[in-house]
From Swiss-Prot:
GO terms for cellular component: tRNA methyltransferase complex. Catalyzes the formation of N(7)-methylguanine at position 46 (m7G46) in tRNA. S-adenosyl-L-methionine binds at E68, E93, D120, D143. This is tRNA (guanine-N(7)-)-methyltransferase. It catalyses: guanosine(46) in tRNA + S-adenosyl-L-methionine = N(7)-methylguanosine(46) in tRNA + S-adenosyl-L-homocysteine. PROSITE patterns: SAM_MT_TRMB. The active site is at D143. Pathway: tRNA modification; N(7)-methylguanine-tRNA biosynthesis.
Length: 236
């Protein structure tokens, strides 16, 4: 018998995302990536049920837990998991080629402190993660949707920050990075209006975030980078 608790039993209701922040298309998968999804998913992947996940059972320990939303090919997750084996890392991604790439690397390196979820972060946060269960959340280079008419598709909106507030432990943190100044300004505006978060540091490149190949290419083209870190209030 399942002992999971539904949203309704937690006194919450499911709030569908008003509009998605991603386009459901993905590049071609290599044969190795397809094979990884078939054979390595049971080891590193998390299949979602109807209630919140038991993260202690999934990782077989109690540890600091960090969530990365939209991890791409998993480069930053891998670097952080290597550097901090005492931490557990969750990654959410909608694109299967990136997931397949990460699974292959996990097997090759023998890392056991990463688990992967395939799905929409909005739904995963609402349905699968207990309140509060995360010590930190990171979102690196989310789609900026640069055209003004598409700004409503940007992930960082007041309703999404409300959701994060429930999932991040008091005293935990929220770290974003973007190479679009306009998006950085929107993020600051949204978070500044939220009582649950306080901005922590300046906006230069963070030494606490791995520098990825994607970021390096952008900087070679003259793109700036805005790192924004916020602390989850202990009083809200």
């Amino acid at each position: 018998m399942s002992n999971s608790i539904t949203l309704e039993e937690r006194g919450e209701s499911f709030q569908p995302r008003p509009i998605t922040s991603f386009v459901r298309r993905e590049g071609r998968m290599t044969p190795a990536q397809k094979k990884a999804l078939e054979h390595l998913w049971p080891r590193y992947g998390i299949d979602l049920g109807t209630g919140p996940l038991n993260l202690a059972a999934i990782f077989n320990r109690q540890a600091e837990r960090i969530l990365e939303i939209g991890f791409g090919n998993g480069e930053s997750l891998l670097q952080q998991a290597r550097a901090a084996p005492e931490r557990d890392f969750l990654g959410i991604e909608v694109y299967r080629p990136g997931i397949g790439h990460l699974l292959l690397r996990l097997k090759a390196e023998g890392l056991e402190n990463i688990r992967v979820i395939h799905g929409d972060a909005w739904e995963v946060l609402q349905r699968a993660l207990p309140n509060p269960s995360l010590d930190g959340v990171q979102i690196f280079f989310p789609d900026p949707w640069p055209k003004k008419r598409h700004h409503k598709r940007r992930l960082i909106q007041p309703s999404f920050v409300d959701l994060l507030e429930r999932k991040i432990k008091p005293g935990g943190w929220f770290h974003l990075a973007t190479d679009w100044q306009d998006y950085a300004e929107q993020i600051k505006a949204v978070l500044s209006q939220h009582a649950g978060f306080n901005q922590l540091t300046n906006e230069g490149q963070s030494t606490q975030r791995p520098r990825t190949k994607f970021e390096a290419r952008g900087q070679q083209q003259g793109h700036g980078v805005w790192d924004l870190r916020f602390k989850r209030s202990v009083d809200s």
